[in-house]
């Protein structure tokens, strides 16, 4: 799954979390303390936990760089752009810049009826969300995924990466 992809890209420690299980500063401190490295880069991959990552950075004696990734695609892109031979400063600059090039979306199930952004949603519908905004709703994962990709991709897009799973 996603954890395996991140491990293959060189991640030393993954803190489990999710939309309803936000890791604490203490969780970050445990991870930091378990890593034997001169420099540690943290990719929160969730806008709700960037503050906890920054608090852990302030509490630690180690050299910590928090790259404020707000979602998994940003974390993936940052990791792909990491250069083990570059300086900490050069990596930080490159990784921060890489975040500006990422557009992300997700396809999931609606948990209730709603109307948002002129999109009528029924509980159980498949919904497409891009950059935190509801874009589409319907019955088919394939059609909603295709619609979402079409809305995200433009003439400046170079790579499309899809992750499938929970």
Predicted regions and their residues:
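N-terminal loops that bind phosphate or other acidic moieties
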Residues: 1-166
